Regions:
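Helix-to-loop junction immediately C-terminal to a conserved catalytic motif
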Residues: 22
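Conserved ABC transporter NBD signature motif
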Residues: 30-38
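ABC ATPase NBD coupling module
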Residues: 39-53
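Short coil-to-helix segment of the ABC ATPase nucleotide-binding domain corresponding to the Q-loop/switch region
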Residues: 65-73
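Conserved ABC ATPase "signature" region
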Residues: 83-101
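Conserved ABC ATPase signature
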Residues: 106-110, 114-116
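Conserved catalytic motifs of ABC-family nucleotide-binding domains
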Residues: 127
Length: 198
């Protein structure tokens, strides 16, 4: 898997890009392809349920539920079957630093960084091939933001997922394998130099 960055200032087209790849909007021109098929030719409901997970800047968690319940609901909605669901969820949350005592707190009681980690686990457990994160460090302090980007990098490389970070932050883009810079709604590709990847 690889981690990609979509880098752009406000108004550059990042939100439109997110709407297009998630199937919330249709392209007026051209087409978006997934596994050699246009998104217009496949069931968008199935695509979003089985292949794409989005981590929103505002986390989009159910604040009246616990961290554990938030992840459990995502697993059920996705239809992913796990042998020992309880252990799978508990271990997935622990792997990002959400201890068992935190797992049983309502997410509204967790810090911003903890909520973002829960949102990342919600995306991970769905089995989606592609995880898109919208401004993943927008509401976080610098250190927590760095931890979240490292977590996405680990997901991309260890779990062989495609991770797409949509951001205005050049430092985040530098951590990605490939960056596409959006300027005036046009993509400009920047690949890491070999010396940077070692």
């Amino acid at each position: 898997g690889n981690m990609y960055a979509i880098l752009g200032k406000s108004g550059s087209g990042k939100t439109t890009f997110l709407s297009l790849i998630s199937g919330l909007e249709s392209a007026k021109e051209g087409a978006i392809f997934y596994q050699d098929k246009s998104l217009n030719q496949i069931s968008l409901t199935r695509f979003r349920k089985h292949h794409l997970a989005i981590v929103f800047q505002a986390y989009n968690l159910f604040t009246y539920m616990t961290a554990y319940q938030n992840v459990s609901s995502a697993l059920e909605i996705s239809g992913e079957k796990k042998e020992n669901k309880r252990a799978f969820i508990t271990e997935s949350l622990k792997s990002v630093g959400i201890t068992e005592d935190l797992q049983h707190k309502k997410v509204g009681q967790l810090s911003g960084g903890q909520q973002q980690r829960v949102a990342v686990v919600r995306a991970m457990v769905t089995g989606a091939d592609i995880i898109v994160a919208d401004e993943p460090t927008g509401n976080l302090d610098e250190e927590t933001g760095r931890d979240i980007i490292n977590l996405f990098e680990k997901i991309a490389h260890d779990q062989k997922k495609i991770v797409i970070l949509v951001t205005h932050d050049n430092d985040i883009a530098k951590k990605s394998d490939v960056t596409y810079e959006l300027k005036d709604k046009v993509f400009h590709k920047r690949v890491k130099k070999l010396s940077q990847t070692k």
